[in-house]
């Protein structure tokens, strides 16, 4: 028994980092010009398929346009209702995720390989033939607006938005955020306009990973790679402006009924291509990126101020931030700043 249970008083030996290879995708240009990136790895019969749209929030004409154009893809096509789409994906054990970012939109499908031809056909119909029905749009907008109103009262959301405003500037795309009234301005015309401009074979890239068989590749080529689809036209590149920091070093947001404080500290870091990026990433991890990090052992374990403290790097197009964040009680807020 003593040989099985380790002596917790003795630190385990330190070992060097094992060498490993990062697998690079095989790239195929399909007949319609779309790029397909393939990573064939794993033994389980599971496939992840990603369609990445090369346009996002920086391309929208009004707030929330990119998000809802993406979100509404699953709400109906000319041949399937939203209920039928959900029922079919559920029947075949598939999972679908729709999301958008500053400069991209994403359609992600997880599927068993044996049903992949069926499930990717559903996704292809959603992407190529979305209709943006009025009734479903209103339901989706109302639900998202309600979630926004709830989140807007959370101190962590308030601090996250404010630190972006201070670092980037309130008129910068990364410092501006949707307001409640922006949800009321969304209509099908706006979404169809964004969909028509950016959801086409000339502005999308495909990624597939898992146990990628010849049949999986044939299904992708059949549903996405033969002919051009959508209103193919050149998409003008949009560059983010330079950040315009406000210069304030300490910002306080008052919320009288809050039970906790959310404290965020941040600054600009070198971007991914910089020679010091990886060293700084390791340093940030040592500071607050894992359970035994400096912030965790000092503020949580030693001082007992909180269960939740961390530091990490956040990458945006053209900018990288290093952020430290914590939730604490008001009584310990001022003490904590000096310790961090």
Walk through the language-model features, giving the residues of each.
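His/Glu-rich zincin catalytic helix
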Residues: 1-87, 108, 192-298
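Cationic, low-complexity basic patches in intrinsically disordered or flexible, solvent-exposed regions
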Residues: 336
């Amino acid at each position: 028994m003593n040989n099985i249970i380790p002596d917790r008083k003795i630190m385990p030996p330190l070992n060097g980092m094992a060498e490993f290879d990062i697998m690079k995708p095989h790239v195929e240009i399909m007949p319609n010009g779309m790029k397909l990136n393939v990573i064939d790895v794993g033994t389980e019969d599971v496939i992840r398929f990603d369609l990445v749209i090369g346009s996002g929030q920086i391309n929208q004409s009004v707030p929330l346009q990119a998000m809802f154009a993406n979100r509404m893809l699953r709400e109906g096509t000319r041949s399937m209702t939203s209920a039928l789409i959900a029922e079919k994906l559920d029947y075949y054990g598939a999972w679908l995720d729709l999301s958008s970012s500053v400069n991209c939109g994403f359609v992600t499908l997880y599927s068993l390989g044996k049903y992949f031809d069926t499930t990717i056909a559903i996704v292809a119909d959603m992407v190529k033939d979305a209709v943006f029905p009025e009734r479903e749009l209103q339901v989706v907008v109302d639900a998202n607006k309600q979630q926004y109103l709830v989140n807007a009262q959370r101190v962590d959301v308030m601090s996250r938005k404010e630190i972006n405003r201070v670092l980037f500037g309130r008129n910068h795309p990364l410092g501006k955020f949707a307001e409640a009234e922006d949800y009321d301005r969304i209509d099908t015309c706006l979404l169809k306009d964004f969909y028509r401009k950016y959801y086409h074979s000339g502005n999308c890239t495909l990624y597939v990973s898992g146990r990628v068989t010849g049949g999986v590749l044939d299904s992708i080529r059949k549903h996405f790679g033969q002919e051009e689809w959508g209103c193919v036209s050149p998409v003008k590149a949009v560059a983010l402006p330079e950040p315009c920091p406000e210069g304030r070093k300490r910002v306080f947001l008052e919320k009288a009924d809050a039970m906790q404080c959310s404290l965020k500290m941040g600054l600009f870091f070198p971007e991914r291509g910089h020679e010091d990026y990886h060293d700084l990433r390791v340093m940030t991890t040592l500071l607050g990126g894992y359970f035994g990090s400096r912030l965790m052992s000092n503020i949580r374990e030693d001082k007992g101020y909180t269960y939740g403290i961390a530091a990490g790097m956040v990458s945006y197009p053209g900018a990288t931030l290093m952020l430290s964040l914590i939730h604490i009680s008001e009584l310990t807020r001022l003490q904590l700043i000096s310790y961090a």
